[in-house]
From Swiss-Prot:
CDD domains: AdoMet_MTases. InterPro entries: DNA_methylase_N6_adenine_CS, SAM-dependent_MTases_sf, Small_mtfrase_dom, tRNA_Adenine-N(6)_MTase, tRNA_adenine-N6_MeTrfase. GO terms for molecular function: nucleic acid binding; tRNA (adenine-N6)-methyltransferase activity. It comes from Aeromonas salmonicida (strain A449). GO terms for cellular component: cytoplasm. This is tRNA1(Val) (adenine(37)-N6)-methyltransferase. One of its GO terms (biological process) is tRNA processing. Belongs to the methyltransferase superfamily. tRNA (adenine-N(6)-)-methyltransferase family. It catalyses: adenosine(37) in tRNA1(Val) + S-adenosyl-L-methionine = N(6)-methyladenosine(37) in tRNA1(Val) + S-adenosyl-L-homocysteine + H(+). Specifically methylates the adenine in position 37 of tRNA(1)(Val) (anticodon cmo5UAC). Its EC number is 2.1.1.223.
Length: 236
């Protein structure tokens, strides 16, 4: 396949024309931020094109295995192709199906860039609507899956709209998951945060607060964003 489409990173390429949700800043932030250095088993819920799984494979130990699940057949197929073309084909497994039905040995780290609009909203593209509609994976479904599939010392890393992050924090204790790190994502200096990178863990924790500003007031990428994404972006 030629590389006249999709998104080329330093060590891999992602085609996403058959995926409802395209490569975007949310996924790139999650893949660059999630604490994967010492993990051996990772689960990516709603992998889409496989972007986050590929980023985590680049950042993790050589013996780390990453399982990635997506409900959409076309996305799962394209994710498999992206993985097959990458340096980590033997370490990433792509599976199609609902996470509510997924069974596996517990994981050290679970990551997700989950759907985030409710029943009152819609999208014209049915596949995109499925990928972004919380009717197929609501907050409690996500937390229940994480509770069931996480080791006793495992962590969950999510990228979420601010309102959804606050909702998750309000109910996560019901699933023995508590805030470890809450990093507000601000698109441009001086604006309010509209996304959150959220890390959850077992047991009560002191939740570390922080922020990442993507663009300075003048529009340039911030030093922090460059530091996070430099291993991936071709021109960083």
């Amino acid at each position: 396949m030629g590389r006249n489409s999709g998104f080329t990173f330093k060590q891999f390429h992602v085609e996403h024309d058959r995926c409802a949700m395209k490569v975007g800043t949310d996924g790139i932030l999650l893949g660059a931020w999630a604490p994967v250095a010492e993990t051996r088993r990772v689960l990516d819920i709603g992998t889409g094109s496989g972007l986050v799984a590929l980023m985590l494979a680049q950042r993790s130990r050589s013996d780390c295995i990453i399982d990635a699940v997506d409900l959409d057949m076309n996305a799962a197929t394209q994710a498999r192709e992206n993985v097959a073309a990458s340096p980590w084909e033997t370490r990433i497994n792509i599976m199609e199906g609902a996470i509510q039905d997924y069974q596996a040995t517990p994981y050290d780290l679970i990551v997700s860039n989950p759907p985030y609009f409710g029943a009152g909203q819609s999208l014209r593209d049915p596949a995109r609507a499925l990928a972004r509609h919380t009717g197929s994976l609501d907050s409690r479904d996500l937390l229940a899956a994480c509770d069931r599939l996480l080791t006793p010392v495992g962590q969950v890393a999510l990228v979420l709209p601010t309102a959804m992050a606050d909702e998750i924090l309000c109910i996560s204790a019901d699933y023995d998951l508590h805030g470890v790190c809450y990093t507000a994502v601000i698109n441009r200096a001086g604006k309010e945060a509209n996304r959150v990178l959220l890390l959850l863990g077992r047991g009560l924790n002191r939740c570390e607060q922080g922020e990442i500003v993507i663009h300075s007031a003048g529009g340039a990428y911030s030093d922090r964003y460059i530091q996070l994404t430099h291993p991936f972006y071709l021109k960083m």
